[in-house]
Amino acid sequence: MKKLIAMLLAMVMVLGLAACGGNNAPAETTAPEAQAPAETQAPAETQAAAPAGEGRVYYLNFKPEADAAMQELAALYTEQTGVPVKVVTAASGTYSDTLTAEMAKSEAPTIYNIGNLSGLKDWDEYALDLTGTPLAGELTTNDFNLYNEAGELKAIGHCYESFGIITNKALLEKAGHSVDEIKDFASLKAVADDIHANAATLGFDAFSSSGLDGSSSWRFSGHLANMPLFYEFRDDSVTEQPAEIKGTYMDNFRQIWDLYITDTSADAKTLSTATNDESKAMFTEGKAVFYQNGTWEYAGLIDAGMKPEDLTMLPIYCGVEGEEKAALCSGTENCWAVNSQVSEADQKASLDFLYWLVTDEVAAQKMVDTLGALPFKAAPASSNVFLADGSKMIEDGKYVVSWAFNHTPNVDAWRATVVTALTAYSADPSDANWAEVEKAFVDGWAYEYNMANG
């Protein structure tokens, strides 16, 4: 695990991805967009409630998969301290809009997430300088944090994650194959093609649904799109957000997308309404061998009845030369900021709550079980199989595929354009429609950069 952390830090410094991703929360998978954010006021009534503490905590959570854990921890903290803690989780894909709306209220969030350096520019004056705080003192590294131009610590990176192709080893072996066969795109395709060709006999297919609705599209407009971005940026030594991109590896993007939408039981013509929950269900119910997602899904897969020994995560292969030496796509977009505009009592209460989350034995264990690896001194080791897979790849000398999508300008708008083009292409996979995907990808980047920077 230490080797994984060290390699991630090296990649962060080399590629300038010094912290979190875009304002759009890629892992958001709960609460339909039409509904208001899910809200819980902690705690529930208890027989021996602590005296009311000073200040209040309002945590605007951007990771729906962590909502249940955060609600539980909020209630526990209030029970122990008397400090009221409210956790609100934004609807899928709406974190940026929700944050803007909530910040305008009289009782604004006291803790919130800043996505990346671009997001920090938007929220700098609302973010307390965390330099010298006890929370900052618990960090094992500062390289995932966000600093403004004055060098002030404005957001603390509190976990790091990886994504790739989650694989059901038991089903793979039932189909007559093994993980060891898959070393690059060609071998992945050979295995997937064989499974798909025999799906009727096997009772399962290769890939789960590549849904393009709001709960799922980030997996492809963000995470899968990271592949062509990463390799282009690596070739061109890109270390900051470029004004334009070339689309050097768009053919590779097309190869892996074609595989996803072909070797599956999902109808490519209806992906615009296919959800992440449906895709996950296909995987947990044994209807698909492969499911593209990240380390954050581990706890949910186990809760759904899957066995740790049956799970592994493969790198995303797309046919790039030398990709057999690739590890998982790893980085972070989880950075805590404390609202500088609320009262000092609320600021202190919020900092105390965050400190408790990463130092209390019970809370820290719950955080690790939910989020994965945490860069704090008291954080226990994670039992997450996918993080162990990532560590093993680093130990074997493979290179980390860093989160190049952190550089995306106007991330929500750019991704939306890419999703629209991918949806049309999936329904009719012609060269003409793929040209529209490339246009959305390349021309859309330049357009959004100009919109963001003038």
Which residues are covered by each model-predicted region?
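Hinge/lid segment of periplasmic solute-binding proteins
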Residues: 50-51, 115-166, 219, 312-315
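Glycine-centered hinge/linker elements that transmit conformational signals in sensory
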Residues: 192-193, 238-273
